[in-house]
Design a protein with these regions (language model features):
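Membrane-interface alpha helices of multi-pass inner-membrane proteins
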Residues: 130, 161-169
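Membrane-interface transmembrane helices that cradle and orient dolichyl/undecaprenyl
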Residues: 147-161
Length: 169
């Protein structure tokens, strides 16, 4: 997985150099990088990071949310685990859910913050936050995406909309 992240980082760095020459076609690799990162985070091997085994145990034992088995997992994770367990017992279903929403919110926020240097923003995100938010602390990924969108709303004076984003997160 580390080599895949490094490869995507190198491709993103190259695209950030070439971005001014790409015109409107830059959105195609932008979306492809987003999809690749979603699949990479959502389909990772359980045990590759410190928290995935805990998430897998909590996913399989969602019925014991208040028990010592899961260690007091938050309610949204328990509800999502119950929903996805109805369809499959594979923990990657919830990994894909969190990766999809976390990365989609962040990539949408990046396009709202900047129109010209999107690949540079993605490159910085990959360097500092991707592995932490989307791979290790998966629930934090959605909250940080909502937080980025809330900052824009606060800057535009729409505090109620910002509060809504934070409440969703």
């Amino acid at each position: 997985m580390a080599y895949a992240i490094l490869f995507i980082f190198a491709v993103t760095a190259l695209l950030s150099i070439l971005e001014q020459y790409m015109g409107k076609t830059k959105w195609i690799p932008y979306i492809l990088i987003g999809i690749t990162l979603i699949l990479l985070a959502g389909l990772r091997e359980v045990g590759i990071d410190p928290d995935s085994e805990n998430y897998a145990g909590s996913y399989r034992n969602y019925m014991f949310a208040d028990d010592s088995v899961t260690g007091g997992v938050e309610y949204s994770f328990t509800l999502l685990a119950a929903f996805f367990n109805f369809f499959t017992d594979d923990v990657h279903a919830i990994f894909l859910f969190y990766a999809f929403w976390g990365l989609s919110l962040k990539f949408f926020a990046i396009t709202r913050y900047t129109k010209e240097d999107v690949f540079l923003s993605v490159m910085l995100y990959l360097a500092f936050y991707y592995e932490l938010h989307e791979v290790t602390q998966i629930r934090t990924g959605i909250l940080s995406g909502c937080y980025l969108l809330a900052l824009l709303e606060i800057g535009d004076g729409r505090r109620w909309r910002a509060l809504l984003y934070l409440a969703i997160g």
